């Protein structure tokens, strides 16, 4: 009922709205920081008016904002006010360093470090269960525990947090190996290649790459939502194109700034372009 009640909120301002249960996130972007601040304040006033018209109150104490920027960019002076009250900013230098959006923990530089830290806490709990149970539970049951608990944790949001740097992902990769050793029943420090193969579990880097290609497959054959597909442009080729390498390839935009490679339009496109042409062609009429 609440979602029906606020269904026309996206029409009240220029903000891009993300409505999830009783949580609402408003997104706005601009190349000029001063223009962004002015636009954000103006649009917040429109949102506040919409709430008042619909007999609701926008609580400024519970409303926070985050300024997304590239790592190592210069610091900007940025303030937002609502009803004359300055809103709290979520940043690395503030009390709150991250915010959760639809299950993904975001920081202002999109390093996904805080998200990975939370994944490690969850996976360590699963590892504790597996370590304690490996002496009396059969391998089949331990594998079931891994797939239902740890596997689902690693899968969720992997095409986003999977674009983090290796220094951020490496502890997660090592933790997955600990989990696999406990599932397979081998001592700590043992090689895990055989265990991954026999258990039919993908290593984290391969899992991330696979999931990017699955998303890219939906984008290429336009089975994903149209508003997402339109951001991914294929390289235009003719039927008689002699450059086989250009067939079934996304046009990857030129990236002039370091850090932008984490955007799905870059990361997903590159994963698809790396995929073997035979796999792309054979998967046309079915799921990848």
Stretches found by the model and what they are:
Residues 25-49, 70-71:
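Catalytic palm subdomain of template-directed nucleic-acid polymerases
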Residues 37-40, 44, 58, 116, ...:
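Hydrophobic packing residues in well-ordered alpha-helices of helical domains and bundles
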Residues 226-267:
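Amphipathic alpha-helical
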Residues 42, 57-97:
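Short, conserved micro-motifs composed of acidic
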Residues 1-28:
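Active-site palm subdomain of RNA-directed nucleic acid polymerases
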Residues 1, 21-25, 51, 99-109, ...:
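Short, conserved catalytic/metal-binding micro-motifs enriched in Asp/Glu and His
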Residues 48-67, 100, 168-234:
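Short, charged alpha-helical motifs in flexible N/C-terminal segments and linkers
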Residues 14, 90-160:
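Basic, alpha-helical interaction scaffolds
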């Amino acid at each position: 009922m609440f979602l029906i009640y606020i269904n026309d909120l996206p029409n009240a301002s220029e903000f891009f709205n993300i409505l999830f249960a009783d949580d609402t996130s408003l997104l706005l972007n601009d190349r000029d920081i001063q223009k962004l601040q002015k636009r954000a304040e103006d649009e917040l006033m429109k949102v506040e008016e919409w709430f008042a018209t619909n007999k609701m109150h926008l609580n400024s104490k519970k409303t926070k904002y985050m300024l997304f920027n590239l790592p190592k960019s210069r610091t900007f002076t940025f303030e937002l006010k609502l009803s004359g009250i300055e809103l709290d900013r979520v940043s690395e230098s503030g009390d709150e360093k991250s915010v959760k959006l639809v299950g993904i923990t975001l920081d202002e530089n999109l390093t996904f470090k805080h998200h990975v830290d939370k994944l490690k806490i969850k996976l360590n709990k699963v590892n504790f269960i597996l370590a304690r149970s490996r002496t009396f539970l059969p391998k089949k049951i331990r594998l079931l525990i891994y797939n239902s608990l740890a596997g689902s944790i690693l899968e969720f949001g992997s095409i986003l947090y999977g674009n983090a740097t290796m220094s951020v992902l490496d502890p997660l990769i090592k933790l997955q190996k600990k989990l696999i050793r406990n599932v397979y029943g081998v001592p700590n420090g043992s090689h895990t290649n055989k265990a991954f193969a026999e258990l039919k579990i993908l290593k984290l880097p391969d899992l991330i790459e696979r999931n990017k290609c699955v998303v890219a497959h939906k984008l290429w054959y336009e089975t994903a939502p149209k508003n997402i597909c339109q951001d991914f442009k294929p390289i235009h080729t003719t039927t008689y194109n002699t450059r086989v390498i250009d067939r079934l390839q996304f046009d990857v935009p030129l990236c002039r700034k370091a850090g932008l490679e984490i955007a799905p339009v870059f990361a997903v496109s590159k994963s698809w372009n790396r995929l073997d042409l035979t796999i792309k062609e054979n998967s046309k009429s079915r799921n990848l």
